[in-house]
């Protein structure tokens, strides 16, 4: 039986966290003894961790003090919280988990670092390192870096050096289509007019403020519609204030976090991704699985999400181009129907089992 340690920053409602839970449920407990190290012990997914997974957390929550401790004393934290030897260690998200596990110097342990975001667009991991050189060194301590899209791999190589990606792997996030379709029937969502849905953490990268600006423009155009934004995050209050101050409550509804967002997606006429920066957008793939037309801004991983445009419509990453694309759905019925056909074509791509097997093969060390 192999001993495997996974590390992740939190168990908040992000795509990486959902993928990790899927992976933990997939791995055979008869083959693997699994330990999960959560750097900041916060998040909604703790109750969904399989019982056979042993869980440890370092800090109760995110804080400036905790960030400083990781930046200054990662090796000490490693020694304190990783007291056993493991066959495999996986830092499943860039940032603190990657920094801490890089301190392992056991030559018998294979170490993997997962990359879910384009750090070249927003270098949000820098706060955990004393210098850029220290971050490069941390990545160099891993046997392999695994990227969730080819676009992220390319951006990482440009930022940190091509030598770090020469032994890299690209592994797309797995999604269980049958479960998503079943959960999409769990409850009813009102649908009495043209409905647009957007799903994601309410953070600057997701572009929900500019989507709200587009909503206001469409109201001024006299269009009748509903925009449902499903998610929560640090920019939620600012988004709520913008909706209220611009008197958009009749059209734009902030749903907040939903453990099961799929009925909102399924009952939409259009799914919109307004992101400024992405890694591999799970919600887009979920919309495609449900056969919902998709319009997305062009950012890291989106072309791979949408089969280079075969399964959805990709626009230049500007507010104006996104507005015009959404407007076409009102003005050109044939355009929306074409998007529907694209999404349905993408929905039959069943890649769940194959992607999970590839991740397991990487953990087993059989994928070069």
State where each predicted segment sits:
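Conserved acidic donor-binding segment of nucleotide-sugar-dependent glycosyltransferases
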Residues: 308-319, 328-334
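Nucleotide-activated donor-binding/catalytic signature segment of Leloir-type glycosyltransferases, i.e.
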Residues: 240-256
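A short, active-site helix/loop in glycosyltransferases that binds the activated sugar's phosphate group
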Residues: 99-101, 140-167
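Aromatic "clamp/platform" in nucleotide-sugar-dependent glycosyltransferases that forms part
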Residues: 257, 276
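A conserved mid-protein helix/loop that constitutes part of the nucleotide-sugar donor-binding site
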Residues: 14-22, 194-217, 223, 234-240
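N-terminal strand-loop element at the rim of the active site
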Residues: 6-14, 18, 22, 26, ...
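Short His-centered aromatic/hydrophobic patch
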Residues: 91-97, 115
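Short hydrophobic beta-strand element within catalytic cores of glycosyltransferases
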Residues: 293-296
């Amino acid at each position: 039986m192999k001993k495997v340690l996974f590390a992740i920053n939190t168990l908040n409602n992000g795509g990486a966290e959902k993928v990790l839970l899927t992976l933990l449920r997939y791995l055979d407990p008869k083959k693997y003894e699994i330990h999960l190290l959560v750097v900041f012990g916060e998040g909604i997914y703790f109750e969904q961790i399989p019982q056979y997974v042993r869980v440890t957390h370092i800090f109760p929550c995110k804080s400036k003090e905790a960030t400083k401790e990781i930046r200054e004393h990662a090796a000490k934290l490693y020694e304190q919280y990783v007291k056993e030897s493991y066959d495999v260690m996986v830092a499943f998200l860039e940032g603190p988990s990657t920094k801490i596990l890089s301190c392992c110097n056991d030559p018998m342990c294979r170490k993997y670092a997962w990359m879910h975001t384009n750090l070249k667009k927003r270098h949000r991991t820098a706060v955990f390192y004393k210098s850029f050189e220290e971050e490069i060194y941390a990545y160099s301590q891993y046997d392999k870096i695994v990227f969730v899209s080819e676009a992220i791999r390319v951006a990482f190589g440009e930022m940190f050096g091509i030598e770090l990606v020469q032994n890299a792997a690209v592994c797309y996030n797995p999604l269980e289509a049958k479960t998503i379709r079943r959960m999409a029937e769990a409850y009813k969502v009102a649908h009495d007019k043209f409905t647009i849905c957007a799903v994601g953490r309410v953070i600057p990268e997701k572009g929900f403020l500019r989507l709200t600006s587009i909503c206001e423009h469409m109201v001024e155009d006299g269009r009748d519609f509903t925009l449902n934004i499903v998610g929560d995050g640090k920019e939620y209050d600012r988004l709520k204030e913008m909706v209220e101050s611009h008197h958009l409550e009749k059209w734009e509804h902030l749903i907040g976090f939903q453990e099961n967002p799929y009925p909102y997606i399924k009952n939409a006429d259009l799914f919109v991704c307004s992101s400024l920066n992405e890694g591999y957008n799970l919600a887009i793939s979920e919309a495609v699985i449900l056969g919902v037309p998709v319009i997305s801004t062009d950012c890291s991983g989106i072309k791979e999400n949408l089969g280079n445009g075969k399964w959805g419509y990709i626009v230049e990453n500007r507010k104006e181009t996104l507005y015009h694309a959404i407007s076409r759905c009102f003005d050109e019925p044939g355009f929306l129907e074409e998007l529907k056909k694209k999404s349905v074509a993408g929905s039959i791509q069943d890649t769940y089992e194959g992607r999970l097997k590839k991740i397991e093969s990487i953990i087993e060390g059989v994928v070069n």
